[in-house]
């Protein structure tokens, strides 16, 4: 067990066992990041009601939070970071915190690295280097490092309104689909036709700048997406040959191909997506006009970029207007 900051420790399963056996009384909060909780590490339940699916169990001298994480690249850690931060902050106010996984190398290192990034405004490399100066074996797996870089890109916070997060969320939904897991409707973005702006500051900003777009069905004018739903992608430079009339190669001039579609996050009006197919058409929820298509396995944009998963709306089927 190594102390990373005052009162904040990183460790492995053996360190956790010592804490649970009351051999290490100074630890008051135990954050366990394990795929499965070993029977001999089980502790009594309590009246404390944690978030759904989260095991949070106090002992007389100890409060414990268990997150069921696997040490694999595809494990989603971003969605639990705020919960980890809250737990660590509370623990440091009143005592000492041990963050542990099986070996004290990857999962625990990822959480403490993220905590240092947020609390000290450190970039990924700097936060990890600082952690490794206290615990040389700390080394998050590549998937965790990618998510920590996303966390850095969002300004050391989990910003669920940012396009960075929405891309990540869509990719994770695609992974769940590929694993055969059911995806709840609540996992999809709200129907923009039913959403209203409630933040006066945001209303003022939008009326001031007037740069945001609404996308409407060309046939019935129903709102089907807004700027917040759009997932941008880097163009691969899709190009097509242009025949020359003069001498020389007929194919030595090319023209860049623009994106003819808009790719969006999955939304609650997309009933065809909720029916469980791998791919299908996206139709207007009001008039049933065809708007585009979806494919959990991905689709190539006209610009050449491969988008996975793909929820594609054709520009020719929509009208775009500023608001």
Task: Outline where the language-model segments fall.
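Glycine-rich, flexible N-terminal cofactor/catalytic loop recognition
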Residues: 1-48
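Short polar/charged helix/loop
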Residues: 16-17, 35-40, 47-94, 137
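PTP/DSP superfamily signal
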Residues: 82-96, 103-105, 113, 117-263, ...
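Short functional micro-motifs and their immediate structural scaffolds
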Residues: 106, 225, 292, 306-309
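Short cysteine-rich clusters marking metal-coordination/redox-active sites
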Residues: 217-220, 283-287, 300-303
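Cys/His-rich Zn2+-binding "zinc-finger" mini-domains, especially FYVE domains
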Residues: 274-290
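Conserved tryptophan-centered aromatic signature that marks the ligand-binding surface of SH3
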Residues: 293-300
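Cys/His-rich, Zn2+-coordinating zinc-finger modules
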Residues: 305-323
């Amino acid at each position: 067990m190594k102390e990373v900051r005052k009162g904040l420790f990183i460790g492995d399963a053996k360190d956790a066992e010592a804490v649970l056996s009351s051999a290490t009384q100074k630890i008051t909060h135990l954050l366990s990041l394990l795929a499965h909780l070993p029977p001999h590490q089980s502790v009594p339940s309590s009246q404390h009601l944690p978030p759904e699916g989260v095991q949070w169990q106090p002992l007389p001298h100890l409060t414990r939070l268990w997150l069921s994480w696997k040490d694999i690249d595809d494990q989603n850690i971003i969605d639990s970071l705020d919960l980890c931060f809250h737990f660590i902050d509370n623990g440091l106010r009143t005592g000492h915190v041990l963050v542990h996984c099986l070996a004290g190398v990857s999962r625990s290192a990822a959480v403490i690295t993220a905590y240092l990034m947020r609390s000290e405004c450190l970039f990924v490399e700097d936060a990890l280097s600082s952690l490794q100066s206290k615990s040389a074996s700390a080394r998050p797996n590549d998937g965790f490092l990618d998510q920590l870089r996303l966390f850095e890109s969002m300004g050391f916070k989990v910003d669920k309104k940012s396009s960075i997060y929405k891309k990540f969320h869509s990719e994770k939904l695609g992974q769940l689909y590929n694993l055969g897991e059911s995806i709840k409707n609540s996992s999809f973005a709200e129907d923009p036709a039913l959403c209203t702006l409630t933040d006066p500051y945001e209303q003022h900003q939008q009326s001031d700048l007037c740069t945001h777009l609404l996308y409407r069905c060309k046939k019935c004018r129903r709102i089907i997406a807004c700027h917040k739903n759009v997932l941008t992608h880097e163009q691969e430079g899709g190009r097509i040959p242009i025949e020359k009339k003069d001498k020389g190669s007929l194919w030595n001039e090319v023209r860049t191909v623009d994106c003819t579609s808009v790719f969006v996050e999955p939304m609650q009006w997309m009933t065809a997506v909720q029916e469980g197919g791998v791919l299908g058409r996206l139709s207007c929820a009001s008039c049933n006009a065809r708007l585009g298509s979806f494919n959990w396995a991905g689709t190539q944009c006209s610009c050449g970029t491969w988008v996975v998963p793909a929820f594609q709306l054709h520009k020719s089927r929509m009208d775009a207007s500023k608001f």
